[in-house]
Every structure is written in C-alpha cells, then in structure tokens.
C-alpha cells in the first residue's frame, strides 16, 4: 500500500492506494467516530463491492445503512441528491454520522455535497472505484451536482476524512470507463510533469491492459500532483484552475450532448485535443507537442474529434463555464508539457479550432 497525504493543516487527510483496500477495517476505523455510517453507492457498484465494504465496517460495531442510487451522469442532479437526504433522515443520521462514497466520480461528488449540506456538515470518506475518480475527482474536496445549463455549477468545497483507492476495483471497469480515467492521467502529466507525460506515452498500452504496476504508478503520481496543487490553492483561486485543462471544451461537449452521452473523461480527452489546437494557433505550443498529445489520447482509445454542436452552441456553453468572468471565456492552454497559461482567446481562433477538431 502507498499513502499520499493532502496537506491542508487541520483538515489534512491520507490517500491510501493499493489492491484489496476496500476490505481493510483498519483503514476506515480512525475516520469513523460516531455511532452510524451511511454508505452511498449505485446499482452497478453495490453488487460488486458493497458486501466487502459492509464486512469491513462490521467489526467497528456501528449501525450501517446503505443508499443505492441509479448509475450514471444523467442522475447527478437535485432529485438524486434528495434520495441521499431521504436515507439519512430515515435512519435518523446525526452530526457524527459518517458517509462513505463507494463508486465513481458521480457518487463521490454527490456524497460529498450531501455531507457538506446535511446538518451543515458531516464527515465523509471517499472509496473511489473508477480510475477517473481515483486519480482526480475523489481528491481535493470539489463536490456538487449538474444543472441543465452547466456542469458542476451547484456544489461546495468540502474535504473528505480519507480517500481509500482500491486499484483492485479497476479490474471490473468497462473499457470506456478505464479510458476515461486514463484521460485524466494524461491531463495531469501534460499540465504539471513533463517526465510523467513521457512515462504515460511509454506505458499507455500497459494502462490499457490494466497492468497493476502501471495503474498503481499512474494513481500514485496523479494523486501526488493533485495533492500538491490542492494544498497550494484549495479553492481554485489561481493555480488549481490548471487542473481544468481540456475541461472548458469538454464540459461544453457534455452539456451540449446531454449528460451521460459521453463520459466525462471522454469529453476531457477530446477537450485536450481542442485546447492543444488552440494553443498552437495562439503561438503558445509547438506543433510537435500537439501531435504527441493527440497521439497518446488516441492510443488511450479516447475520441479526438468533438461533436458538431455548432460554433454558437459551443460558445454559449463555454460562457457558463465556472472559469468564465463577465461572460468572457477563459481557457487553460499549454505552453509546453508541464507549463500552462490561463487566458482568453479571440473568437476567430476558437472558431478555427472548432472547424479543425469537430465533425
């Protein structure tokens, strides 16, 4: 087992990474101080890992309940969030009840938001079961739900007590979900660590094959990088925004097609292709680096051309992105691997990128 720490002073917490961790009682025990636990999971994950988690919690002598939600990005909304509150109130959960998010990014985001809101804040633990959630969404305290007009527009910054990333859970991931997680790994290397990006290029096939050593290193290094960024800028006042490379175009794709049509990581992968194209057009990135990024995204079996939503629709959706200010779109662009720039771009350059990178 590897442990990476997120250094946030009194709110610091560990990220435990390894195989078989869902069943290890001792990893949960220090973070559950109340008399009850509510597991939040979904219809896909509960049959796979719910019993193992409940068995791990049983020796603690707590009252354990489970809320099972429908699976998918399409359910990341108010109605589904209320199902969590229904379960907590039915079980008479109190301020010391610990929520445990067992699932991917949707479950983690909604459970964290519910924890932030219920009785104005109760503790929660992240148990991410997808590659994307292990390398990205479970770390850093971003929680929330979608709105029809924009992704993740309603939420809170609320840190977990711990993240328990069991890479054994990645063996049951569908291929599309695995590729979606590799997209966030690629993003992390591209924005923050050129040496890690080189490693990803050399090992993308090993990740596709789910080789345990490759997956463990990808999760570890991605978490180390994200932990350092979050420690420096917890609430995205500046530096943390670089983690949104590919997300401005990507969120527009997700909202434009309808949430769940493309997986989040698929949209981010394509969004990176689009952002790299724009980076070249603005004279920030060299063409050879753009081609390297495109090639590794394609090698991860991710889409490299966006849907034809139309220029006006893309611009409309990107203007409601969380990074936008006074309607001005801000892009995270690459200067070189490991070096980014947050900037606006002329509409003409954006239109040229859309013409080149969409169907």
Curated annotation (Swiss-Prot):
One GO cellular component term: cytoplasm
Gene3D superfamilies: 3.40.50.1970, Dehydroquinate synthase-like - alpha domain
GO BP: amino acid biosynthetic process; aromatic amino acid family biosynthetic process; chorismate biosynthetic process
Keyword terms of this UniProt record: Amino-acid biosynthesis, Aromatic amino acid biosynthesis, Cobalt, Cytoplasm, Lyase, Metal-binding, NAD, Nucleotide-binding, Zinc
Pathway: Metabolic intermediate biosynthesis; chorismate biosynthesis; chorismate from D-erythrose 4-phosphate and phosphoenolpyruvate: step 2/7
Cofactor binding comment, as recorded: Binds 1 divalent metal cation per subunit. Can use either Co(2+) or Zn(2+).
InterPro entries according to UniProt: Dehydroquinate_synthase, DHQ_synth_AroB, DHQ_synth_fam, DHQS/DOIS_N, DHQS_C
Positions with a binding annotation for Zn(2+): 184, 247, 264
SUPFAM superfamilies named among the record's database cross-references: Dehydroquinate synthase-like
Residues annotated as transmembrane: none
Reaction catalyzed: 7-phospho-2-dehydro-3-deoxy-D-arabino-heptonate = 3-dehydroquinate + phosphate
The keyword Disulfide bond is assigned to this record: no
Cystine residue pairs: none
Cofactor dependence: Co(2+); Zn(2+); NAD(+)
Entry annotated with the keyword Phosphoprotein: no
EC number(s) from the headed UniProt entry: 4.2.3.4
Subcellular location: Cytoplasm
GO molecular function: 3-dehydroquinate synthase activity; metal ion binding; nucleotide binding
Pfam families (alphabetical): DHQ_synthase, DHQS_C
Residues that coordinate or bind NAD(+): 71-76, 105-109, 129-130, 142, 151
HAMAP family named among the record's database cross-references: DHQ_synthase
Classification via NCBIfam families: aroB
Function, as annotated: Catalyzes the conversion of 3-deoxy-D-arabino-heptulosonate 7-phosphate (DAHP) to dehydroquinate (DHQ).
Assigned protein family: Belongs to the sugar phosphate cyclases superfamily. Dehydroquinate synthase family.
Protein name stated in the entry: 3-dehydroquinate synthase
Native source organism of the sequence: Burkholderia ambifaria (strain MC40-6)
